[in-house]
């Protein structure tokens, strides 16, 4: 009986933390969606890479909403000893766990396919908005300067852009030499000779270089999810 009470309290506290984290992510997501410029000023290049490939605001709102609901179900289920709510909590967590495993497998096996898919989304945005939408341009400039890369794939992503057509030059990072000193004006010939790597490949390279850390975080998250599922099922099975 004492063990049951202890696990019940731990379940409540653990899910209270998830609930608060979800609320925080929701708040940040709404902030980013409403005022992305100030978010970028506060977090700088820390957030710029991610903002190239996902709409950070909507992503945070979605993740925050899931955590918020999950935390609420866990807290309410443990506190009220409601078997139906505990089963809902377990089911949602199981679906998330399976989706994460599937996503990891797809990311590992179909990296090239993911690159092609993202190219179809990102390159047209570069061609249309770079140099004309302030937030978009600032994010890309920060990313290219911090990661020492050019475009999504390489400098050719800018060939059909309004920016190059009207200014006849490429962004300075596309002409950076190994010492990261830019050669200006950055013409197509100079950009071609410099062979600056695309930002997608650079991000992949950095992720692989930190594979142990990334893997450790993934294993830690998976372990927490498994523990939460085991605890919720234990409470479910021991409730009358």
Swiss-Prot record:
Membrane topology designation: Multi-pass membrane protein
Regions crossing the membrane: 12-32, 53-73, 89-109, 211-231
Locations listed in the record: Lysosome membrane
CDD domains according to UniProt: uroplakin_I_like_LEL (cd03156)
Membrane listed as a keyword: yes
Sugar attachment sites: 154
Keyword entries, A-Z: Glycoprotein, Lysosome, Membrane, Transmembrane, Transmembrane helix
One Gene Ontology CC term in the entry: lysosomal membrane
Location, primary (coarse class): membrane
Record-level GO BP terms: protein stabilization
InterPro entries in the record: Tetraspanin/Peripherin, Tetraspanin_animals, Tetraspanin_CS, Tetraspanin_EC2_sf
Pfam families (UniProt xref): Tetraspanin
Record's keyword annotation contains Zinc: no
Protein task: Structural component of specialized membrane microdomains known as tetraspanin-enriched microdomains (TERMs), which act as platforms for receptor clustering and signaling. Participates thereby in diverse biological functions such as cell signal transduction, adhesion, migration and protein trafficking. Regulates neuronal differentiation in response to NGF by facilitating NGF-mediated activation of NTRK1/TRKA receptor tyrosine kinase and subsequent downstream signaling pathways. Plays a role in the inhibition of TNFalpha-induced apoptosis.
Subunit structure: Interacts with SLC19A2. Interacts with NTRK1/TRKA.
Similarity field: Belongs to the tetraspanin (TM4SF) family.
PANTHER family in alphabetical order: TETRASPANIN (PTHR19282), TETRASPANIN-1 (PTHR19282:SF216)
Record-given protein name: Tetraspanin-1
Organism field: Mus musculus
Lineage of source species: Eukaryota, Metazoa, Chordata, Craniata, Vertebrata
Annotated gene: Tspan1
